[in-house]
Regions:
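Transmembrane alpha-helical segments in integral membrane proteins
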Residues: 1-5, 75-86, 175-193
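Transmembrane helix boundary and interhelical loop/hinge segments in multi-pass membrane proteins
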Residues: 1-14, 22, 26
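Juxtamembrane helix-boundary/capping and inter-helix hinge elements in multi-pass membrane proteins
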Residues: 13-20, 85-88
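Secretory targeting signals
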Residues: 28-90, 94, 99-105, 109-110, ...
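Terminal transmembrane helical anchor/hairpin motif
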Residues: 99-192
């Protein structure tokens, strides 16, 4: 409703403070993004229980990771909405803010490669932390440990298979950092509101 003057006038004549309107709309929008995750998570729990592979720790890590990343991206989208005030400019600015640092790094590095002797890289990754999507994809990963097990085929031929013994999420704390940044962006959006 913030993109139309008539809607803004109507909503702000209601006897609700601005903070109440912001919080209500923010939480309802965030809840709508979480509904598909809840359905998918419930189906995964049912399938893992039926298969005898349910892991409560893995489920908790997955839920926290999804909540943290979703909160960051939703908060940054809300902040960009309040900066632009235009429904058509919002997606462009959102994508630009999330990938501008990496694009500039690539552009400057590829430009410098033609002028600086010995500079032979197209991407340095120095400012990668300013691009949340690229940084999380490159730094948060699953560390798996396997054990080799000797088995035999029904005809008696031996073979070696790898059995997964543990899987841990490396650099999980980065998701928490970005969730805190999302909290700061939500607070800035509230101030702009």
């Amino acid at each position: 409703y913030l993109y139309s003057a008539r809607s803004v006038g109507l909503m702000h004549t209601l006897p609700i403070r601005r903070e109440g309107l912001f919080l209500t709309n923010f939480l309802s929008g965030f809840a709508m993004t979480l509904i598909p995750y809840a359905v998918t998570g419930l189906l995964c729990v049912i399938v893992s229980l039926c298969g005898g592979a349910f892991d409560a720790r893995g489920l908790a890590v997955t839920v926290l990771a999804v909540l943290g990343e979703s909160f960051f991206y939703f908060s940054s989208a809300t902040f960009v909405c309040f900066i632009t005030g235009n429904a058509f400019a919002m997606p462009a600015l959102y994508a630009l803010l999330h990938f501008l640092a990496v694009l500039l790094d690539w552009l400057i590095s590829s430009f410098a490669q033609g002028f600086i002797f010995g500079f032979s890289t197209y991407y340095t990754g120095v400012v990668e932390w300013l691009s949340p999507t690229v940084y999380l994809v490159n730094n948060v990963r699953c560390a798996r440990q396997y054990v080799e097990v000797q088995q035999t085929f029904p005809d008696g031929t031996p073979y070696t298979s790898r059995l997964l013994t543990s899987a841990d999420l490396e650099s999980f704390w980065l998701i928490g950092v970005y969730a805190l940044v999302g909290l700061a962006l939500a607070a800035l959006a509230l101030i702009l509101y």
